[in-house]
Amino acid sequence: PVSSLPSKYGIGCFSKEAYEFVDCLERAGQSKWQVLPLGPTGYGDSPYQPFSTFAGNPYFIDLDTLVKEGLLTQDEINACYWGDNPTQVAYDAVFWYRFPLLKKAHARSEYREEQGYEKFCMDSWFWLNDYAFYMALKFHFDNKEWLAWPEDIRFRKKEAVESYREELKDEIDFWKFLQYKFYQQW
């Protein structure tokens, strides 16, 4: 899987290492690479228990590409602890450091003005809004399972849904941005 590629940022991603691996496969006469599963992982980081069938794992977004796009600085990335061994996934480091960096990239991006973003949202209408809302709620409730959320939102009561959509609109937007970046790089 992508996550098992060597990386200086805690987990394999859509980085130059991925492209180098594809080149290696080609030189070896291989025409296929089993990259699945690509979904966003939850507690325990099992790729077989993703939060969504359609969403991509934000861990796979290449931070160096975000630097090239002017959304992050190399100093910001280097200030993070990514684990001691680039050949082993450092899930704790990835969780605690990657999301704050991705939030900075989101705040600096003008992606809403890109035609590609609007098209991505339109093409992904059948899953993106619900996924982004769910993830915003999950982080709002300290990553607790949905059964531990307040009853009104757990049962998707209209007033609660409307209230949380308004309260968490920036967070919802962040999760949409992550999916846009994932699919741009994928």
Predicted regions and their residues:
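Acidic/aromatic-lined carbohydrate-recognition and catalytic surfaces
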Residues: 1-186
